[in-house]
Amino acid sequence: MSTYTVTGQFQSRDGFQPFTKDVEAENEDLARERIYTTVGSQHNRKRPQIEIKEVSAA
């Protein structure tokens, strides 16, 4: 498992809220999926409301 740094933003009441998170995943696609599930569940947002800008290996 590698660690990936994911940056992006999600829609909130006041516009978009930026975020940067470190996740462990086997590849970049799984890191994106992990972000969609964690940010979506923590902030009650659907996938179209989450915009991932960059995924890079940490």
Swiss-Prot record:
Biological process terms in GO annotation: translation
KW Cytoplasm (keyword) present: no
Molecular functions (GO terms): large ribosomal subunit rRNA binding; structural constituent of ribosome
GO cellular-component term (any): ribonucleoprotein complex
Residue numbers spanned by region Disordered: 37-58
Keyword Ribosomal protein attached: yes
InterPro entries listed in its UniProt record: Ribosomal_eL20, Ribosomal_eL20_dom
Key words, A-Z: Ribonucleoprotein, Ribosomal protein, RNA-binding, rRNA-binding
UniProt feature, compositional bias: Basic and acidic residues: 48-58
Domain of life: Archaea
Subunit annotation: Part of the 50S ribosomal subunit. Binds 23S rRNA.
Family, as annotated: Belongs to the eukaryotic ribosomal protein eL20 family.
Protein name per its UniProtKB record: Large ribosomal subunit protein eL20
Organism encoding this protein: Halorubrum lacusprofundi (strain ATCC 49239 / DSM 5036 / JCM 8891 / ACAM 34)
